[in-house]
Amino acid sequence: MNDAVAIDVRGLSKSFDGKRVVRDLTLTVARGEIFGFLGPNGSGKTTSIRMLCGLLIPDAGEGHCLGYDVIRETAQIKREVGYMTQRFSLYEDLSVRENLDFVARIYGVQNRARVVDAAIERLGLAQRREQLAGTLSGGWKQRLALAATTLHNPKLLLLDEPTAGVDPKARRDFWLAIHQLAAEGITVLVSTHYMDEAERCHRLAYLSFGQILTQGTPSQVAASSGLTTWVVAGPDLMQLAEALQRLPAVAQVVPFGDALHVSGTDAAQLATALAPYQARVELTWTQTQPGLEDVFIQLVTEAGEGKA
């Protein structure tokens, strides 16, 4: 396996009770890269992450994580990985420092006190080191969980929807910490529902019904979508949206603040269909690049139609 590659898997699949949850997962992630997994609930994100870090054995496929075989060397993978689950899993009746000291003991961390103090400083927890974990806000709990996840100096972080239910400022601060860790050479694989977080990833993949529908940098994903998108502003937008949604050339109409994003997969047909509406003086039309949310709404719509 190339030393520059952290994850290289091909054709990973997993079923539960006869239902295929992940199908033919093929993925390459570079060392020091932040790679995002996006998709609706039940799309296979968590199962994929658990297979990559050795917590689940795939039913089919092959590959390596950190140079170890994902089927035969799962114990070695686990020692090199930090896995942060969706739910806060530390002890709420212990302080910040007590929790970190406990986790460090479990991992057998040498120079435990120094390592714990360094983690507290790195994640900005110094003012809260004696505070009980149960009294922390959601954002501070996530910082504490991230500190615990990195105590044993892992080479790969797997973060499963780490900022769900966290306010925007706390999410931003959390992502600053993730980028700092990536800059230090740690590879990060993260699942998220938030489009602004997806744009913070170096590369990303979108899953639906257990399959990767698209992957690449955020700009590559948007450019390869085949969508043409217009932004329209003006009065009575909800009535306008209802009318536009009835046009065959319009794939989707999505409200964004005080405007609508109107997208289609055939630029010429879309232009023809929108021409009468673009002639209305009370409406302002601007063509724009499709955003990730435009792309992902289209992907999940197409995937749902394919399963119908």
Question: Where does each model-flagged region fall?
Answer:
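Catalytic Walker B motif of ABC-type/P-loop ATPase nucleotide-binding domains
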Residues: 157-160
